[in-house]
Amino acid sequence: MPQLGLLPGRAWTVLLGLLRPPPGALCIRAVRSHSQVAEALFASQLKPHQEKSNFTIKTPKGTRDLSPQQMVVREKILDVVVSCFKRHGAKGLDTPAFELKEILTEKYGEDSGLIYDLKDQGGELLSLRYDLTVPFARYLAMNKVKKMKRYHVGKVWRRESPTIVQGRYREFYQCDFDIAGQFDPMIPDAECLKIMCEILSGLHLGDFLIKVSDRRILDGIFAVCGVPESKFHAICSSVDKLDKISWKDVRHEMVVKKGLAPEVADRIGDYVQCHGGISLVEQMFQDPRLSQNKQALEGLGDLKLLFEYLTLFGVAEKVSFDLSLARGLDYYTGVIYEAVLLQTPVHAEEEPLNMGSVAAGGRYDGLVGMFDPRGHKVPCVGLSIGVERIFSIVEQRIKTFGEKIRTTETQVFVATPQKNFLQERLKLIAELWDAGIKAELMYKNNPKLLPQLHYCENMGIPLVVIIGEQELKEGVIKLRSVASREEVAIKRENLVAEIQKRLSES
């Protein structure tokens, strides 16, 4: 007989109906009810006990656990990122892991199909957040906030095919920094790019490049090349793939799959394969076709100003004007940017290789207005750091160089060589904790000294305090350096001060 706790809801409903039949019910009713219960039980598809043993314990596809060693690496990365955000005056903010489905729909273009939808018994249609930008815009509109500089570190979810080796998952962290409010052009945008440079330099990931463009320039290119306005989004998503596939393949997609005329695709190719610095911006100002488009001229004007500010910030050499940059998300309205790591070429004449995007962002002046009942806009610009991609790179380097990672921050271990000293150890470690010293002890009444010392060596704990019968009589504590194995006797009342002194010097 199957366990009652495993009965499906339908079987319970029918069974309760059988146990409480209506007054005067005929026997034939009971017979039919028996039959219905049997059908419901068979429909439950309960697996036999022997099949249950085949169940594989694992994490869902596209997710993973992080070991203590991995958590240390991640926390160090997040410390660098968040410290930079705070250095630039950002306030912390958090939003729910899931939003009303209506909040997220029609904000991500072709990527909208990657949103996780939830079933809710309360009747609301819900979805897991796809990024941290749309919830931020909803927060601004809902709370009537007109100016804010905020950072947010949190998980997001996407139903894409995960590629673990490339650091892509279905559940992952994002670290966002955004500036909301009406300000003079390009000053907040330049600060966002400066922040990108500070973070990537601080993480010591190697050489990097920030590609920058403007959605207005891209739309202007499409217009002067003859792309129908109804195809702008579709062609934009194709151009956005140029960092992954060749122009030949992108052109094929435009013409064959999206119905663009071959000559129009060729004209687009003349533009989107260009990249350079401020000189390319000046060149585009002189372009006979692009210079006739108002949108493109506005975008080029802002980029020229942006490069002036980046020069003052001392980071202009890290930024390249790249006309192939598209950023497929629908909510971008102006400047867009993306940071990529560069692999040093084998030969001097070769160009650096693109190892993939590790940060991205842009301006989205219309997103908040989508949530405001009166359509009031709050201009915004921001960036997102790709923590998972960075984590994968750092983790691989640690494995390559065989670096050892400490999984705890313990500074002192309280040890004893003798039996029946648990009470003294507990008093001593409480004193260390109260003084703000990170300390551990072994959870045994009578531990042996050698395993305690081995534990300190394995965990990288720098100091050991040793208390025994002789030390207790003399009113001292032995302080041992794990690295040098040198021991000194310290007066009991001076122990905390001596430990703090040594830790400050290390």
Curated annotation (Swiss-Prot):
One cellular-component annotation, GO: cytosol
Enzyme Commission (EC) number: 6.1.1.21
The organelle targeting sequence, given as a residue range: 1-33
Modified residues (N6-acetyllysine): 444
Entries under InterPro entries matching the protein: aa-tRNA-synth_II, aa-tRNA-synth_II/BPL/LPL, Anticodon-bd, Anticodon-bd_dom_sf, His-tRNA-ligase, HisRS-like_core, HisRS/HisZ, HisRS_anticodon
Keyword Acetylation: yes
UniProt main location, coarse: mitochondrion
Short name of one Pfam family: HGTP_anticodon
BP terms from Gene Ontology: histidyl-tRNA aminoacylation
UniProt-listed CDD domains: HisRS-like_core, HisRS_anticodon
Keyword Protein biosynthesis part of the UniProt annotation: yes
Residues bearing the modification Phosphoserine: 67
Annotated GO MF terms: ATP binding; histidine-tRNA ligase activity; identical protein binding; RNA binding
Keywords: Acetylation, Aminoacyl-tRNA synthetase, ATP-binding, Ligase, Mitochondrion, Nucleotide-binding, Phosphoprotein, Protein biosynthesis, Transit peptide
Chain residues that bind L-histidine: 131-133, 158, 174, 178, 327, 331-332
Compartmental location: Mitochondrion
Entry-linked SUPFAM superfamilies: Class II aaRS ABD-related, Class II aaRS and biotin synthetases
Listed Gene3D superfamilies: Anticodon-binding domain, Bira Bifunctional Protein, Domain 2
Catalytic activity: tRNA(His) + L-histidine + ATP = L-histidyl-tRNA(His) + AMP + diphosphate + H(+)
Subunit structure and binding partners: Homodimer.
PANTHER family, sorted: HISTIDINE--TRNA LIGASE, MITOCHONDRIAL, HISTIDYL-TRNA SYNTHETASE
Family: Belongs to the class-II aminoacyl-tRNA synthetase family.
UniProt function note: Mitochondrial aminoacyl-tRNA synthetase that catalyzes the ATP-dependent ligation of histidine to the 3'-end of its cognate tRNA, via the formation of an aminoacyl-adenylate intermediate (His-AMP).
Protein name from the UniProt record: Histidine--tRNA ligase, mitochondrial
Provenance organism: Bos taurus
